[in-house]
Amino acid sequence: MADDWESAADSEIVIRPNAANNINKWEGEDDDEDVKESWEDEEEKKDEEKPTKTEAPVKTKPNKALKAKLEEQERLKEEEEQKRLAEMTPEEKLAEKLRLQKIQEESDLKSALETFGVTSIGGGLDAFNPESKEEFKEFGATLSWKVAQYRESIHFPQFIEDLVRSLCCNLSAADIKKVKMSVESLHSEKLKMEKAAAKKSAMKGKGKVSLRTENDDIDGYQKYGNDFTDDYDDFM
């Protein structure tokens, strides 16, 4: 009976392998490698996403040598121009003066046209055929500039008077009155300007300081008969 129990116990005993021993010791290393690779990928993405710093442009200081060279060239150019003018004959100087005057007149005309909002004058006075208000304004600006070229002549005032009279002959009495009022207004403004200029010039003349000397006092006494030289002669 005892033998049966022992045999039964022996048959029931089952040796189970240790689960811990069956675990592959290399298991999990692949997972670690995958985690590391994912970290490396994320780091690379972060590096790519970081904005690249743009270097500020370096401000270069002006080259003093270049500046001095340009100034020297300008000075030499001016000296050559002065030398050229000095070597000119009277006829050449007159021609040069007229050339510069023409340039100045063209500049004045351009300024006058810009004042009236005119961009160009086309082919000159002969090319004008004004019909609208703007066209007459443009024509008037050009004509005024042309006439003003002779303002330095002694005959210019009389010429303007005759011209205005001749033009006003074609106007009605009401229109002539408008012209008269406009000229009178201009006359008042000119009169104020001339008076102010004359007053300013007079004030400058009064500002001159005269030096006072010791002889001024002696001369003053002599006016009243106090001549010290005579007293000295009487004493002697």
Swiss-Prot record:
Compositional bias annotation for Acidic residues: 28-46
Pfam families for the chain: eIF3_subunit
Q: What InterPro entries would the database entry show?
A: eIF3-like_dom_sf, eIF3j
MF GO annotations: translation initiation factor activity
GO terms for cellular component: eukaryotic 43S preinitiation complex; eukaryotic 48S preinitiation complex; eukaryotic translation initiation factor 3 complex
Question: Where is the stretch described as Disordered?
Answer: 1-86
Tell me where it resides. Cytoplasm
The keyword rRNA-binding belongs to this UniProt entry's keyword annotation: no
**Record's subunit section:** Component of the eukaryotic translation initiation factor 3 (eIF-3) complex. The eIF-3 complex interacts with pix.
Record function comment:
Component of the eukaryotic translation initiation factor 3 (eIF-3) complex, which is involved in protein synthesis of a specialized repertoire of mRNAs and, together with other initiation factors, stimulates binding of mRNA and methionyl-tRNAi to the 40S ribosome. The eIF-3 complex specifically targets and initiates translation of a subset of mRNAs involved in cell proliferation.
Which HAMAP family does this entry report, sorted A to Z?
eIF3j
Q: What is this protein called?
A: Eukaryotic translation initiation factor 3 subunit J
Q: Which organism is it from?
A: Drosophila mojavensis (Fruit fly)
Q: Which gene encodes it?
A: eIF3j
